Design a protein with these regions (language model features):
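PP2C/PPM-type serine/threonine phosphatase catalytic domain
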Residues: 1-234
């Protein structure tokens, strides 16, 4: 199993509020996307990722289904504690998406709209589930998936770490053999690059170069947000 990654500030933003962490040996991968003024978003995303990774590494045995909630709660509490000490950061928070690969299983969890995709030879499947206004509208049939991609409120999220003690968690298990690769990313990629283009890049580009090509494509389409990608060869 190999993993390669890249993060980029994008075209229009001054600061990069995304964060990523990879633990190759234990097959644990994190992407977080912070929000909040006064550079607070980049603090929130870093706290979340580092808190989760440290907690993960301390565990002798990791049961994703039962333990991932505890990791996310720890990350949430760490951000809230930081805000209590640094009141100028009030209002900051972060999304997070996590993937964990065991012998046969692929586990994914997320809070917010950072995503994980499963890549096969002929398809790209979103494995995570967005906590966002447009996702709710799609779910109740008010708008189509295609309309959601262009919706003016597509950046409004309905769950995040560091905002409140209560937050939504989505988690799911897949058969690892169903996919050749997984892609974790912030919405700076998913809002700018279509699934068809992602699949084309995975098909034609050398694995080591995929993160750069994905980031370059997002920037070529406008680069309206920070862009972070983690590509894992299963």
């Amino acid at each position: 199993m190999r993993a390669v990654a890249r993060t980029d500030v994008g075209v229009t933003r001054e600061n990069n509020e995304d964060y990523l962490l990879i633990h190759d040996a234990l097959n644990f991968f994190i992407v977080s996307d912070g929000m909040g003024g006064y550079q607070a978003g980049e603090i929130a995303s870093e706290i979340a990722a580092k808190t989760m990774m440290e907690s993960f590494k301390k565990r002798d045995k990791f049961n994703f289904e039962s333990d991932i909630d505890a990791l996310l709660i720890e990350a949430n509490e760490a951000i809230l504690a930081y805000v209590k000490e640094h009141t100028e950061c009030r209002g900051m928070g972060t999304t997070v998406v996590v993937a964990y690969v065991s012998d046969d299983d692929l586990w994914v969890a997320n809070v917010g709209d950072s995503r994980c995709y499963g890549i096969s030879s002929d398809s790209v499947k979103q494995l995570s589930e967005d906590h966002s206004l447009v996702a709710e509208l799609v779910k109740i049939g008010s708008i189509s998936v295609e309309e959601a991609e262009k919706h003016p409120d597509r950046n409004i999220i309905t769950s995040a770490l560091g905002v409140d003690r209560k937050f939504e968690i989505f988690k799911v298990k897949y058969n690892k053999a169903d996919f050749s690769h997984i892609l974790l990313c912030s919405d700076g990629l998913s809002n700018m690059v279509s699934s068809n283009e992602v699949l084309d890049i995975f098909k034609r580009v050398d694995f080591e170069q995929i993160p750069k090509v994905l980031v370059d494509s997002a920037n070529a389409h406008g680069g309206r947000d920070n862009i972070t990608v983690v590509c894992v060869e299963l």
